[in-house]
Amino acid sequence: MCLSNNYIKGDVHVETRELLRSHSSVRKYTGEQISKETVIDLIETAQMAASSHFVQAYSVIWVTDADKKKKLGELSKNEFQFGTAGGSFLFCVDFKRLHVAGQMHGVDIVADSAENVLVGVADVSLFAQNFVIAAEAKGYGICYIGGARNNPKDISELFNLPEYVFPLFALTIGTPTKRNETKPRLPVAAVLHENEYNIEQYETLLPAYDATMENYYASRSSNQKMATWTKQMADFLVEQKRPFIKDFLASQGFTWK
């Protein structure tokens, strides 16, 4: 079924475009809790994201228990966010459900391949982004929390994650106490390549982007600093992050065959 021109043009298109272009992370919330009806609506919307071969390799833990929420905040080093958020969630790559599906037909699926890890990460990411867009369309703020990978073993034990399931990131949602400015992104020319990859353009595009980001960091309304994008990336990526992840994934049944 094709969508009508009236659907893809006009106010709906403009509002969607502006919503997507106005995203910024929110880390301070009023504490007002979101309803179960809202959570179900967001999950149903998230489920309409594309999924590789329709495996739907994702599960979400909605953290409503105060003690578990506090512990998740400690383990991910984001106590304040979880303390004020209206909803706290842990997004997981999930091949356990697929393993059960295979057993229903007398088959042991191959969950522990590098390809399937990539499939799972892609599925969860697409699912989560649909969740985020739906939440922001309702006026909520959100923040992805990669810190959930700081202590994946402890977090897995906290939420009783079985073999073939691992936490990818957490996410907070709620009514913002304030909204941050939108960070300038890389210029389109730096990410869009026509017909072949063009590395030469970075010699001019990256210094220009550094100037843009330096001005943004110096003039934003809070947490001003002197920094450039390339220097931050160099400092961040100069050493291996979370070297324990490979062994943790193996302990969950993903041995990268």
Question: Where on the chain are the PLM-derived regions?
Answer:
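Acidic, surface-exposed loops and disordered segments
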Residues: C2-K257
